[in-house]
Amino acid sequence: MYAVFIAGGKQHRVEEGEVLRLEKIEVATGESVDFDQVLLVTKGDDVKIGAPYVEGAKVTAEVVSHGRADKVRIIKFRRRKHSMTRQGHRQWYTEVKITGIAG
């Protein structure tokens, strides 16, 4: 059984017990969170496709941790000008464990 849902503007395909990183969610570690924007749910040969979402379907997850991803370095180089701009970025994320798929 797996589902496709939307979180943080991205679509994620998940199965029960899977751990994945999402955009940061303001929920404390150890708490449960529900995602109700489910696009697709499958159970064996039974496939439910939403238009746009599957009614009554939800994905439940437990927050495992919060953190920051590795640094991404941005360099803008201007040729022949002896000029360069450097910048770095570390994105916040929330790690969740999928505990249930209903629908």
UniProtKB/Swiss-Prot annotation:
GO BP annotations, alphabetical order: translation
Q: What HAMAP family would the database entry show? A: Ribosomal_bL21 (MF_01363)
Q: Which Pfam families did the record assign?
A: Ribosomal_L21p
- To which protein family does this belong? Belongs to the bacterial ribosomal protein bL21 family.
Gene Ontology cellular component list: cytoplasm; ribonucleoprotein complex; ribosome
List, alphabetically, the SUPFAM superfamilies matched: L21p-like
Recorded GO MF terms? rRNA binding; structural constituent of ribosome
State the protein's name: Large ribosomal subunit protein bL21
Instruction: Alphabetically list the UniProt keywords.
Output: Ribonucleoprotein, Ribosomal protein, RNA-binding, rRNA-binding
What role is this protein assigned?
Answer: This protein binds to 23S rRNA in the presence of protein L20.
SUBUNIT field: Part of the 50S ribosomal subunit. Contacts protein L20.
- Give the source's domain of life in one word: Bacteria
